[in-house]
A protein has these predicted regions:
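Extended, low-polarity transmembrane helix blocks
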Residues: 2-67, 73-76, 80-96, 103-161
């Protein structure tokens, strides 16, 4: 038996006994804050797509998304069929994914879907050279990447991965 097998690890010493629990609680809190922020931001971004002149409706949604698709097609290389299909799914996807994150439903998979959705949005904004929007979405993607690193500390979820 080697001497290293007889030596207790520093984490197992009495002086460090409570530190892993404290660290775990802090990481759980950090993940929860990230999950709630990303979920709320995603949900509200989806709901805002249904707004027009102070009211929310499906008619507003299709008008807004049609205008968005036309604008991106007119300012980029992307065809209207592609931008229109993405735009018509976008608001619903944001609402469903945002709600799933807030509730903690399959959080790891939901975070990946959220990240992919934001990368898709970034692609459209890159195509129309909207650098401020790209930077804004890059921050969101960074937060999602951070949440994916911390997802193993997800203690408050309705349906875990």
């Amino acid at each position: 038996m080697s001497s290293s097998e007889n030596t207790p690890s520093p984490a197992a010493s009495p002086a460090n006994a409570g530190k892993s629990t404290e660290s775990s609680c802090e990481l759980t809190a950090a993940f929860l804050l990230l999950r709630l922020f990303i979920g709320l931001r995603t949900l509200l971004a989806g709901i805002e797509k249904f707004e027009g002149k102070g009211t929310y409706s499906f008619a507003n949604y299709y008008e807004n998304m049609g205008r968005m698709a036309q604008g991106i097609t007119g300012a980029s290389f992307m065809p209207l069929w592609m931008t229109r299909n993405f735009a018509h799914v976008l608001g619903y996807a944001l609402v469903v994914i945002g709600a799933a994150l807030l509730l903690g439903l399959k959080t790891r998979a939901t975070l990946v879907l959220t990240g992919l959705l934001y990368v898709g949005l970034s692609f459209g904004l890159i195509a129309v050279q909207e650098s401020e929007g790209v930077a804004w979405l890059a921050i969101h993607v960074g937060l999602i990447a951070g949440a994916l690193v911390l997802v193993r500390h997800n203690r408050f979820a309705l349906w875990k991965d």
